[in-house]
């Protein structure tokens, strides 16, 4: 096999790995809401949202990868009323510091689930919400 053919084979293997890595996301494993069953649409337990098993009703929990990048410097001061339902599916990578200060008044059903490193989630100390 020539060097060029071997290099082409390696590039194709990397592309296939990239495609399947984005389509499948995280399956079983880790901890979080639902005992690590987020990959099967059971992210918030058997009750879930919408009467099904998790966010998407009875669909599978396979979401595409994030795939984007950018600088997201966001500063909010004052009163910020938020009404309605907000759902984020998939992975939201955060590199840098995330800080929240002040009281957070919430009414209704509020669920916050996820992983933050290294101070909370997965047995790394208390969860402060």
Curated annotation (Swiss-Prot):
Signal sequence region: 1-21
Protein family: Belongs to the chorion protein family.
Keywords (A to Z) from UniProt: Repeat, Signal
Recorded GO MF terms: structural constituent of egg chorion
GO biological process, one term: chorion-containing eggshell formation
Region (Left arm), start-end ranges: 22-64
Name of the protein in question: Chorion class A protein L11
Keyword Repeat in record: yes
Region called Central domain, residue ranges: 65-112
